[in-house]
């Protein structure tokens, strides 16, 4: 079982732009980042990441969320698996 403090540390530490940047090539666009959707085959970037709000939105598929939900969607992980993945990435365990 994952401790509540580990979950809190993951949400405090994981930067959405760093997590997504491991899978998607992001380009700075004002205060946000944009890139091609990892969930669809597209030529024009419709995938946006907001470091300020710590959220992402894929306008081609309608999906969006935070660093944890991105890992869940992209890697087909459960919530506990995504938390464990991010805890390991940020050396929180």
Name the predicted role of every residue range:
Residues 1-93:
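N-terminal structured subdomain of primase-like DNA metabolism proteins
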